[in-house]
Amino acid sequence: MDRYDFSLKLERAFVEYVDRHADEKGFGKGEFAHLVWPEDSPKAASSRWSAMRSKATNTGKPQGLLISDAHRMAAVLGVNLGYILIVLEDRAEMSK
């Protein structure tokens, strides 16, 4: 697996991790999105989070994840971003 593919795999693993942990903490999809992007309207924040979790109809790919968004998501969950990335990177390495 080349570095680009690995990076995309890590990004997708991060989104899945955050989605799962937000559900486990009892956040609704819209509620979580609004906590991550409080400057956006609730509808815009929900659309943004949905675009990261699912494939777009025009490209067939989910929206990419900015490091700033990843940091915000980790903060809402109360988990250190570096910790999440290390755990997910180790898991991805083992599944190569």
What residue spans do the PLM features occupy?
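Recognition helix of helix-turn-helix/homeodomain-like DNA-binding domains
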Residues: 38-65
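Sequence/structural signature of long amphipathic alpha-helices
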Residues: 35-39, 90
